[in-house]
Amino acid sequence: VKYRVVLLTLVGALALSSCTLVAPNSAPSRVKTVPFGLLSPTIPGTNHARVRFITQPVYIVDAAGDLAPSSRIVPEPPALATVIEQLLLGPTHIEKSAGYTSALPKSLVVLSATVDEATGVGVIDFGSSLNALPPKQQLLAIGQLVLTADVVGAKRGLEIRVAGVTQNVLLPSGKHATLVTPRDFQSLLNG
C-alpha cells in the first residue's frame, strides 16, 4: 500500500510538472484576428471618429486662498459636464503639495451640467446644496464653478440648481442671485 501511494504521488507529480513544460518561443507571434476592433485606430463605438484631447482651465483655490486657473485634459470639444467632473476631482498631487485646494465638497454629485448655446447661460444641477458650507468656502466654491463654466462657454453666467430647483446663491458683495456671472467673482481671483 505504501508503494502504491508513493508511485501514485510520483505519477501525479510528473503529470502536473508536464503542464509547465511549454516550449518557449523567442519571437512574438502575430495575432491574426482581434475581436471587436480593439486594434483599430479609433475607439470602439465612436463611428470611426477620432477623439482629440485639449487642455482646459479649471479654477482651484491657491495657497493664498484666491482662485487660480489650472489646466486639465478633456476631450474636444469640451463639454461643461466633463470639465466640471475634472474640477470636482480636486487639485492634482503636485498642486496639493504646492498648497492648492478645492472649496467644493468631495461628496458633491453632478446630476447634469449644460450650456445653452443660444443664451450663453450654463446650468449645473447638483444632488445636494452648497448652502451648508461656511460662507467663505461657499463663495470660493461658487467662484470655482462660475469661472470654470465661463471658459467652457457659459459667458452670460451660471445657474446653480439642486435637484432641479434653482438656488439663490451668495455673491462676494453679500447679496444673493439666481444667475451668477464671472464678473461677480473677479475679486476672488489671484493677482
Language-model features, listed with the residues they occupy:
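Bimodal "functional hotspot" detector
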Residues: V1-G191
